Amino acid sequence: MSFVRVNRYGPRGGGRKTLKVKKKTSVKQEWDNTVTDLTVHRATPEDLIRRHEIHKSKNRALVHWELQEKALKRRWKKQKPEISNLEKRRLSIMKEILSDQYQLQDVLEKSDHLMATAKGLFVDFPRRRTGFPNVTMAPESSQSPTVVSKDPVTQAIRSESVIEPQALNEVDDDEQEGTVNSQSEESENELDNSLSSQSNANAGTFLHQIKEENSELINKLWTDIQQKVATQSQMTASSGTPSSASPSGEQKAALNATNAVKRIHTRLQPEESTETLDSSYVVGQVLNSRKQKQLLNKVKRKPDSRAPSKQKSSMLSASTASTDLPSSSNPSLDVLKHMIHEVEHEIEEYERWTGREVQGLQNSQGLTGFTLSLVSSLCRLVRYLKESELQLRKEVETRQRLEEALGDHRELIDALTAEVLFLREENTATQARLQQYMITTDEQLISLTHAIKNCPVISNKESQALERGATSQRHIDNPEDPAVNASVSMPLMFRGEDVVEFPQEDLPVKLSQVPNPPESGDLASSLPGHIFEPAVLLTPPRQKSNSEFSPLQDVLRRTVQTRPAPRIPPTVEIIEKEQNWEKKTLPVGADIQNSSDESHLFTQRWRASHMGEDSQSKTQAPFVSLSQPLCSSQSSMQQSRNPTLSEEPLVLGDGQQLRTNETLIQRKDIMARIAELTLQNSDIRAHLNNIIGPGGEQGDGLREFNRQETSHASDTMATFPAVQPLTPSSMEERIAELNRQSMEARGKLLQLIEQQKLLGLNPSSPPVSPVQSPLRAWAEGGKRTIEVSIPGAEAPESSKCSTDSPTSGLNSRRSSGAASNSCSPLNATSGSGRLTPLNPRAKIEKQNEEGWFALSTHVS
């Protein structure tokens, strides 16, 4: 394969030209968007901008700057004519001179640094004097202006004498007199400003050529420069340094015979001394060594080729300004010592403030002591800085731990706050439920009160009570009337007009929430009519548990019962609990207290008389006891008025909790008991009328008893006994009193037995014995007891009553202690007495069946 490129078509114009075949232009078809839509792949404006930025050239700014420079150069070439050869030579000479001066200045600065460092190591730093370097110039040549430097530190003492070059190289030629004068002026300027450099040989040659070509221009320039330098040297003459010791005046006159040299020496002589160089100048050179270099670099960067005279004058002015810097801004050694003392004093204050050990000031002499104190101060400062940094780190760690603890405490506080809010919400809900319960209870109490008030039967019973009171009054006024009021057996709860009403549905936990007695209505008008009608007791009374009895009742029962009994009727405890509850709900008064004491005493006496009652047989006289039905009806009425007392276990005044099951069973038997007991009450009234009816003076005794009983019952109907707290001493006194009353009751019963024996053995005598035990009233602290003697009835009527009602004996014995308000001589207030008429035909059976206190045991 050949790499030679050959013209395929041959030379132009030769041969046959080939015809160009025109391509057929194909018709552009329209884009079919139905196949694929490529607009989704089109770049967004942001993508286009990013791509442009990516593909831009990195050197764009540099190229732009270069292009601008080229354009500026073109304009400058067009505007400015070409520089002459003289200007080019002048610029080259100045560059050479200035470069040499700059290099020399750098070398001097480095040596100054080295000397200052060595001076700090040795206490006796070298003593140096000012030298005047003099350069012998070649004939017919002038020295170029150099940068003035006032630093004479590194200049060695070259000679003991000051020899001017003009004294050694004097020329008698008058033509060169101006040149010598100019050279002498230059040497004067050099002495004034302590010049320390010399020009190169090349510079001299160039200047000689320039002088030959342009002597007039150079002479004019140098005259201007000399005038400026002379004025500046006069201003800085006072700051000149002493020179070395000069030889004798004769030698001076011989060597320096020129007028310029004499004038300079006469000016410098008063200032000459043998003192050493000021150390502050040295320290200033060490501390401010770079200032002169910076100023010279600035001068170096400002070349001006358009005006050589301006260039030279600006260079000289910059050099003189640089020479003025050490004298004006350099601190002395004393100032530095004072400053380091201030630093040490501040460090001491800091040490006292922070509680550190204070270190004394160090007496520094010379630069060595200054350096030592400076280094020690720096070490102390660095140590304190390190300690403060460690303390700061510890504080940061402590702060982090405290922040963590604070976060934990905040979480705990938030949790406790949430718990408190939750408890507050629960408390609010509980209070709302309690308020709702109280409102519901109040509504139920109000509704129950209205229901009891609106019951029409109580008003009928009230009228019956009024009629009963009238009948008893009629018996008192008519002592010969044998009739006995048999309608005095209304239960205790329904005898008064001011009776406390108790709710049916909910009994409040606190007894103080029960409505007040003045708001209660007449209970006698709110009971159904069949309550006091004759009834038959179908079920015997249930034995209550001992937990339902109060502790006082248990003590009294154990004290009074001198013999064990097979069964104690529970209705007595029910009556006492009712009376105690009524006492807690009603206010305390003097009459109420008396009634309460009597009720307690007679209830216990009734118990003493009922210990052996269950052992009596059915063949006994049917009128064994009249108190059971009435008291049973009374307790049944009390239970019927509180049917919902034990829907919830409630705590009463004595702290006992009623049992729910027992109360539910009581609720079911309430109505049946009421009917049965009312029937028994009617039967007992009929039997009482039949027994007492035939006797004449019997009626007197019973009327008297009925009158006293009715009057006493009217007292108890008005108000109910209140609660009286019993102390152990009062309980013992009460027990002793009960025992005494029991003994008195035995005596009275013996008298009644004697009367019954007389009636049974002497049927021809009057039916009622004229011997009658008087009514006895005793008072102890406002208490009273009415005791009467009631003669028994004849045997035929007793047998008749027993045949008419064969179950009346059993029923009356079962319901003993329920209706004692009407005819009990032992307790006319609480309803717990017993009447046992004599039946001679059943004497033997009664002796076998009755208990320890049966009346038949006393019959002979």
Curated annotation (Swiss-Prot):
It holds the Pfam family SPICE. Residues 308-330 have a biased composition (Polar residues). Its main location: cytoplasm. Residues 236-249, 808-824 have a biased composition (Low complexity). One of its GO terms (biological process) is metaphase chromosome alignment. It is found in: Cytoplasm, Cytoskeleton, Microtubule organizing center, Centrosome, Centriole; Cytoplasm, Cytoskeleton, Spindle. Keywords: Cell cycle, Cell division, Coiled coil, Cytoplasm, Cytoskeleton, Mitosis, Phosphoprotein. Transmembrane segments: none annotated. It comes from the Eukaryota. Residues 383-437, 729-755 form a coiled coil. InterPro entries: SPICE1 (IPR031387). GO terms for cellular component: centriole; centrosome; cytoplasm; spindle. The modification Phosphoserine is found at S646, S765, S769, S824. The modification Phosphothreonine is found at T236. Residues 160-200, 232-254, 293-330, 790-860 are annotated as: Disordered. Regulator required for centriole duplication. for proper bipolar spindle formation and chromosome congression in mitosis. Interacts with CEP120. PANTHER family: SPINDLE AND CENTRIOLE ASSOCIATED PROTEIN 1 SPICE1, SPINDLE AND CENTRIOLE-ASSOCIATED PROTEIN 1. This is Spindle and centriole-associated protein 1. It comes from Bos taurus (Bovine). The gene is SPICE1.
